[in-house]
């Protein structure tokens, strides 16, 4: 009887622990922002890393647009591949845990979109269609920037 009680307590603690981890995985480390958006609270170095990644996405988008404008498919491929899923592969798990699920989902879907743009360009998809794909990806950037801000918690 005593071992059943201990087993029940252990199981309960396990379930509570999993629930807490799931809550933080979904919610991330957030607080009310200063401008109506939700602030994601990060350490300064983590914030810098996320902003650097965002600038990389913006630079890749510019490269796609320049390539499209010049009819340079190789440039479109190079620019979009630079921002694909491979560029997000080495993100620190501790940082990922601090990011809300929606933020992570939007970010990862933009990286996936960049890979899809590269595949489309490699497959000979016409430039107007590439531009539509790029516009769809940028819509996600706008949605994310409309909902979230990065804070160092100070």
Per-segment meaning from a language model:
Residues 8-24:
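Hydrophobic membrane-insertion alpha-helices, especially the h-region
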């Amino acid at each position: 009887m005593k071992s059943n009680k201990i087993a029940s307590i252990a199981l309960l603690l396990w379930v509570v622990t999993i629930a807490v981890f799931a809550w933080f995985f979904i919610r991330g480390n957030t607080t009310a922002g200063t401008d109506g958006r939700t602030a994601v609270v990060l350490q300064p170095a983590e914030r810098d890393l996320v902003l650097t990644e965002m600038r990389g996405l913006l630079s890749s988008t510019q490269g796609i647009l320049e390539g499209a404008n010049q009819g340079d498919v190789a440039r479109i491929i190079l620019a979009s591949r630079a921002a694909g899923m491979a560029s997000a592969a080495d993100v620190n798990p501790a940082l990922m845990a601090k990011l809300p699920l929606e933020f992570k989902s939007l970010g990862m879907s933009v990286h996936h979109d960049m890979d899809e743009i590269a595949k489309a360009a490699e497959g000979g998809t016409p430039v107007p269609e590439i531009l539509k794909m790029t516009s769809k990806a940028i819509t996600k950037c706008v949605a994310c920037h409309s909902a979230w801000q990065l804070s160092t918690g100070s």
